[in-house]
Amino acid sequence: MGSGASAEDKELAKRSKELEKKLQEDADKEAKTVKLLLLGAGESGKSTIVKQMKIIHQDGYSPEECLEFKAIIYGNVLQSILAIIRAMTTLGIDYAEPSCADDGRQLNNLADSIEEGTMPPELVEVIRRLWKDGGVQACFERAAEYQLNDSASYYLNQLERITDPEYLPSEQDVLRSRVKTTGIIETKFSVKDLNFRMFDVGGQRSERKKWIHCFEGVTCIIFCAALSAYDMVLVEDDEVNRMHESLHLFNSICNHKFFAATSIVLFLNKKDLFEEKIKKVHLSICFPEYDGNNSYDDAGNYIKSQFLDLNMRKDVKEIYSHMTCATDTQNVKFVFDAVTDIIIKENLKDCGLF
């Protein structure tokens, strides 16, 4: 009788030990899990950062996966040239070559009749002729006055390559492709012994109400703001400047009670586009009080200070900032390494080890 009870006790003790071990393993795993939230206004580059994580920390895009982006890229090309042609009417810009007016009409007819995501030779020729026209180029130069995909010139300048029958999108082509994010997209990867769960949330106003579900237990927020958006208006409200919207959103996030203990990293993104734009468009279009040099460094630092000055708890909460170009893999790799180090440092601080 006694030996039976003893065997039972041993079994219970064994099970208890296994459960303890499992709980400890789960706790260790949980401690090594980093919940990362990507926030920012629409078209600030969040989804491109997610694609970079796949390239840098997973095994990149296979040829089969790249091929799946072909239809998206063709859709982006068509939407871009259509946006420019429609804006010519709105802005009252004439074609340099009168025959291009026929091409403009033909473009609209073809766009309505072709299968989505395809690029028939007839359409390619029409787009090629239009893109070469001086009036179309003049309208492209005024892209801040209407809604145009950032990658428009990247694709249109390489029309021959991307419409070749054997075309396989490169990783750079994939990075520059644009699909509006709706809902929440989760990506998992590991770096420096940490398991990341990265959540990309739609940035347009209609998508933001879905963010609240992701708030609990967030380790770090990466907030993306497009530097180049200082002279642009929102897709969803053409009365609101994109930079002002981004600042308003950042203010509500960095001072939110939910994020009192959350590390916040600011990615001032699209620095490549900003560097080109700042040579032509003065920052005072967005910040009338700005009277500094209209240089990349001075204007960039001014924008950075506009964001960082919104932090009401500077004495206890540091916000880390980086100038980024989300389509540049090396730049993102370097910056994300720095973010990972921040997270490790903050974790050690929480444990009293730093």
Curated annotation (Swiss-Prot):
A lipid is attached at residue 2 (N-myristoyl glycine). Residues 196-205 are annotated as: G3 motif. GTP binds at residues 40-47, 175-181, 200-204, 269-272, 326. One of its GO terms (molecular function) is GTP binding. GO terms for biological process: adenylate cyclase-modulating G protein-coupled receptor signaling pathway; background adaptation; cell morphogenesis; cone retinal bipolar cell differentiation; detection of chemical stimulus involved in sensory perception of bitter taste; detection of light stimulus involved in visual perception; dopamine metabolic process; G protein-coupled receptor signaling pathway. Mg(2+) binds at residues 47, 181. Keywords: ADP-ribosylation, Cell projection, GTP-binding, Lipoprotein, Magnesium, Metal-binding, Myristate, Nucleotide-binding, Sensory transduction, Transducer, Vision. The gene is GNAT2. Residues 7-27 have a biased composition (Basic and acidic residues). This is Guanine nucleotide-binding protein G(t) subunit alpha-2. Guanine nucleotide-binding proteins (G proteins) are involved as modulators or transducers in various transmembrane signaling systems. Transducin is an amplifier and one of the transducers of a visual impulse that performs the coupling between rhodopsin and cGMP-phosphodiesterase. Residues 324-329 are annotated as: G5 motif.
